[in-house]
């Protein structure tokens, strides 16, 4: 191989490597939203609705009712009524103990 052919080969290979590297970075993140290079782009462009704080608040809103230790008011009332009914049924004479 002549020197000019080697130089031409090196030039072409370096251009191909440069082009392939820049081509790999040019991904349309609107189409490939889950591509590793596109992670976080929607949050950066989206504004407040997609911010991390907004997301955490939304998660809290969705999970709080399930994580609260306090029973809903209806369940407390049903539990109280079932206790009164059990007490009534356990005393056939009709005498009932006072419940709150």
Curated annotation (Swiss-Prot):
Principal location: secreted
Cleavable signal peptide: 1-24
Tissue expression from the record: Expressed by the venom duct.
Positions of the pro-segment in this chain: 44-100
Top-level taxon in the UniProt lineage: Eukaryota
GO cellular component: extracellular region
Disulfide bonds: 29-38
Cellular location(s): Secreted
GO molecular function, one term: toxin activity
Keywords: Cleavage on pair of basic residues, Disulfide bond, Neurotoxin, Secreted, Signal, Toxin
Subunit and partners: Monomer.
Protein family per UniProt: Belongs to the elevenin family.
Misc: Negative results: has no effect on six different human nAChR subtypes including alpha-1-beta-1-epsilon-delta-epsilon/CHRNA1-CHRNB1-CHRND-CHRNE, alpha-3-beta-2/CHRNA3-CHRNB2, alpha-3-beta-4/CHRNA3-CHRNB4, alpha-4-beta-2/CHRNA4-CHRNB2, alpha-7/CHRNA7 and alpha-9-alpha-10/CHRNA9-CHRNA10, when tested at 1 uM.
Role of this protein: May mimic the function of prey elevenin neuropeptide. In vivo, intracranial injection in mice induces hyperactivity.
Comment block on domains: The cysteine framework is C-C.
Protein's name in the database: Elevenin
Source lineage: Eukaryota, Metazoa, Spiralia, Lophotrochozoa, Mollusca
